[in-house]
Curated annotation (Swiss-Prot):
Organism: Caldicellulosiruptor bescii (strain ATCC BAA-1888 / DSM 6725 / KCTC 15123 / Z-1320)
UniProtKB keywords: Ribonucleoprotein, Ribosomal protein
InterPro entries found in the cross-reference section: Ribosomal_bL35, Ribosomal_bL35-like, Ribosomal_bL35_CS, Ribosomal_bL35_sf
Classification via PROSITE patterns: RIBOSOMAL_L35 (PS00936)
Protein's name according to its UniProt entry: Large ribosomal subunit protein bL35
Keyword Disulfide bond applies: no
Domain of life: Bacteria
GO cellular component, one term: large ribosomal subunit
HAMAP family in the cross-refs: Ribosomal_bL35
Single Gene Ontology BP annotation: translation
Keyword Ligase: no
The family this protein is said to belong to: Belongs to the bacterial ribosomal protein bL35 family.
Length: 65
């Protein structure tokens, strides 16, 4: 069986925490920011844990990470 390939696009967007959780950045902070409140933009900066429903897909796309 051939080696599994890592999904390079996802590998650049996801980091793994020390406890093994997958971390990602929030979407929506690149442009069209003038209509968003200060609080909303501040909250978009934060890193969040990948939702449990998506963890299986992430593990499949990142077999060696």
């Amino acid at each position: 069986m051939p080696k599994l390939k890592t999904h390079r696009g996802l590998a650049k967007r996801i980091k793994i925490s020390g406890s093994g959780k997958y971390l990602r950045k929030k979407a929506g902070k690149s442009h069209l920011l003038s209509g968003k409140s200060r609080k909303r933009k501040r909250n978009l900066k934060k890193t969040v844990v990948v939702d449990a429903t998506n963890v299986k897909a992430v593990k499949k796309l990142l077999p060696y990470l």
